[in-house]
């Protein structure tokens, strides 16, 4: 890797397009750039909106109105909003169409003239998303952003944020290698993205011709996403369509400098702008959220399963450092970076319920009725057979008994029946969604990322400012003092 220059000097007077601007990772990226380099020229933030007014409202409510920006607000005081007004341009549009669906011709031409960096953070991360929606956003959306980037006259780098789990359910060491057009995970030949698109269109046309309801079409599209993903070897539609998106970028990048960032499971901020900021219920947060509420009594996980976690601020820092490291590197093979912890600082999945028990026993969640929710120790099952036995005895059989009793006694037990049915559905849904990762035996190789860390430490004075070494994390300390309190404050409350 070539010697890196100063990150702050690189960001100075640069114009950056950020897609998916209302997403949590994009917000952390925006906050970091504005706080660390106030001399950045412009941040163009793409938000899904049809007009300027709607976009401006979303920008305030979903981005700068968030607590995430409290440190920047404290630093700038009364000048915060004038600073944001000067440095940020809201862009109403969508990554699902040509030229990002921009209607303002003058703004579009300004962006093509001014933009130096494009960072694509837009995605739908729903594991059970409709196939048509996921294909449009995660796959073709990436291509639309690339096409827009190619029209930017001053472009120095295009950074695409994907996910490490495009690897599917591989075992052993998973290398930081790109995906090329037509590659499937199970060795099946004939994977063609355009064919997948045509299959979706044909199915929707067939359903509409038959007079299917929107609810029926939605359900069919969700089922189709799962079926097509598994047909080619991926466990769910999210990672499948993200892999397809990478294939399109590799196929059509041309001479554009491209870097692909593949984070693992993203958790709350480790240090900046303050520890513990998290937004929404992400993958791993289902455990503390449902356990803290007293709704999760058991958990299924392999005894040797390593859960690969990485705080969001480290992902953003790695993205910025990679952006600087590969700027202006045209006609070279794009470098892919795994940003995770399983290789450098692994944590066993089985430690999670134990830490959750310790935290919520000492710090019970206070429910909306102002009552503390007392939790018991969750049962942890290390195999599907023991879990299925538990499920049958404690949920499926009682559910069947209540169903029969309801029929005999004119719905007398309806309340209990519906409550148990909800709990059963929740448990089955969580297991189905996360089943591929509960016994995951892969370790994400981070050799490229380690080289990037070394290059940053050797070449730039701001290496400590843009930290992303997971070896700095004590997982027990992080969960008990940072992540769980953050989930309670920003999600549960």
Swiss-Prot record:
It comes from the Eukaryota. It catalyses: a long-chain fatty acyl-CoA + 2 NADPH + 2 H(+) = a long-chain primary fatty alcohol + 2 NADP(+) + CoA. GO terms for cellular component: intracellular membrane-bounded organelle. Keywords: Lipid biosynthesis, Lipid metabolism, NADP, Oxidoreductase. GO terms for molecular function: alcohol-forming long-chain fatty acyl-CoA reductase activity; alcohol-forming very long-chain fatty acyl-CoA reductase activity. GO terms for biological process: long-chain fatty-acyl-CoA metabolic process; suberin biosynthetic process. Its EC number is 1.2.1.84. NADPH-dependent alcohol-forming fatty acyl-coenzyme A reductase that catalyzes the reduction of fatty acyl-CoA to fatty alcohols. The recombinant enzyme accepts saturated and mono-unsaturated fatty acyl-CoAs of 16 to 22 carbons. Belongs to the fatty acyl-CoA reductase family. PANTHER family: FATTY ACYL-COA REDUCTASE 3, MALE STERILITY PROTEIN 2-RELATED. This is Alcohol-forming fatty acyl-CoA reductase.
């Amino acid at each position: 890797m070539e010697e890196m220059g100063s990150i702050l000097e690189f960001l100075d007077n640069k114009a950056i397009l950020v897609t998916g601007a209302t997403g949590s990772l994009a917000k952390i990226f925006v906050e970091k750039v504005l706080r660390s380099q106030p001399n950045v020229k412009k941040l163009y933030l793409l938000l899904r909106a049809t007009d300027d007014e709607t976009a401006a409202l979303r920008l305030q409510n979903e981005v700068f109105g968030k607590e995430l920006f409290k440190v920047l607000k404290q630093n700038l005081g009364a000048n915060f909003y004038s600073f944001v007004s000067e440095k940020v341009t809201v862009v109403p549009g969508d990554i699902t169409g040509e030229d990002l669906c921009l209607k303002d011709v003058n703004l579009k031409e300004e962006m093509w003239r001014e933009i130096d960096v494009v960072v694509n953070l837009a995605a739908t991360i729903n594991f059970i998303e409709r196939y048509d929606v996921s294909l449009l956003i995660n796959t073709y959306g990436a291509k639309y952003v690339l096409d827009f980037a190619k029209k930017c006259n001053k472009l120095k780098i295009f950074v695409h944020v994907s996910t490490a789990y495009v690897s599917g359910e591989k075992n052993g060491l998973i290398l930081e290698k790109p995906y090329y057009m037509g590659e499937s995970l199970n060795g099946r030949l004939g994977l063609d993205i355009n064919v997948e698109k045509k299959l979706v269109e044909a199915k929707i046309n067939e359903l509409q011709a038959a007079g299917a309801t929107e609810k029926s079409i939605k359900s069919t599209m969700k089922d189709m996403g799962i079926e097509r993903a598994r047909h080619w070897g991926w466990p769910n539609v999210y990672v499948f369509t993200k892999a397809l998106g990478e294939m399109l970028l590799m196929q059509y990048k041309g001479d554009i400098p491209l870097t692909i960032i593949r984070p693992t499971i993203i958790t709350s901020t480790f240090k900046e702008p303050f520890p513990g900021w998290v937004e929404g219920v992400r993958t791993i947060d289902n455990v503390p959220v449902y356990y803290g509420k007293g709704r999760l009594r058991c958990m299924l996980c392999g005894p040797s399963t390593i859960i690969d976690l990485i705080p969001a601020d480290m992902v953003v820092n790695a993205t910025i450092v990679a952006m600087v490291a590969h700027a202006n590197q045209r006609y070279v093979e794009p470098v892919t970076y795994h940003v995770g912890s399983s290789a450098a600082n692994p944590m066993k999945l089985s430690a999670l319920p134990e830490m959750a028990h310790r935290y919520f026993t000492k710090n019970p969640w206070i429910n909306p009725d102002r009552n503390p929710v007392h939790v018991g120790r969750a049962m942890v099952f290390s195999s599907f057979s023991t879990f299925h036995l538990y499920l049958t005895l404690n949920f499926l059989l009682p559910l069947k008994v209540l169903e029969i009793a309801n029929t005999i006694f004119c719905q007398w037990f309806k309340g209990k029946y519906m409550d148990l049915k909800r709990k059963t559905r929740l448990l089955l849904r969580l297991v189905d969604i996360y089943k591929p990762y509960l016994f995951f035996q892969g370790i994400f190789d981070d050799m490229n990322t380690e080289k990037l860390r070394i290059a940053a430490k050797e070449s730039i004075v701001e290496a400590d400012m843009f930290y992303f070494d997971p070896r700095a994390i004590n997982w027990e300390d992080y969960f008990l003092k940072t992540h769980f309190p953050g989930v309670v404050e920003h999600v549960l409350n």
